[in-house]
Amino acid sequence: MAASKERDQNIQKVIKAAQSLFISEGVAATSINRIAREAGLTPMSVYRYFGTKDSLVLAVWRDALVVFYEGFMARYQERVKNLRTGYDRCLAAMAEYNSTYITFPEWYRYTREMLSYTTSPEAGDIDMDKIFWQFYDREIPIPSAKAIEEGIDDGSVRPDLNTRMFLQLMINAYTGVDIFK
């Protein structure tokens, strides 16, 4: 196997091992030694691939958001395949958000932990919130936003609905975060 392919596989093993441990036990409670052991590597290998625990936490957070979004979208697409109105698709999106957090309560805890995660001064400009909002400002609300717009177009949603306010309230409800200042 080529060295670069092995390196990429090892990086993914570390990310997946760390993700599982971070979600089940928390970031602070999980050491690099434990992650390395779970990934079948040495702690030095983990540091060689990521440099710092903060950099690993960032890579894991990005990957977790992708995994969350892809899983959510697959379940949402299945849920809406026979629905006709934007209103019904919006309700389905909200039901899927709710179902996701009920089915995966550890995701909610992990999200809260990551939004309050403080990097070390050596981490530089790593901004965990920014990574989260890249997804929650775009990918995550897309099904609901699109459904609301379709609902306005098909008459199943009132045309005077403030869609931005609706999406903000929905995001707040499903993330447990109040971002109004």
Regions found by a protein language model. Give the residues of each.
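Amphipathic alpha-helical packing segments from all-alpha helical-bundle domains
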Residues: 66, 70-73, 119-154, 164-168
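Hydrophobic alpha-helical connector segments
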Residues: 59, 74-106, 163-170
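Amphipathic alpha-helical segments used for helix-helix packing
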Residues: 100-127, 180
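Short coil/turn segments at alpha/beta junctions that flank glycine-rich nucleotide-binding fingerprints
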Residues: 24-28, 104, 154
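N-terminal intrinsically disordered/low-complexity leader segments
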Residues: 1-9
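Hydrophobic/aromatic-rich alpha-helical bundle segments in the mid-to-C-terminal region
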Residues: 108-113, 130, 152-181
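Helix-turn-helix
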Residues: 2, 13, 21-59
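Generic hydrophobic, amphipathic alpha-helix propensity
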Residues: 10-19, 35, 60-64, 68, ...
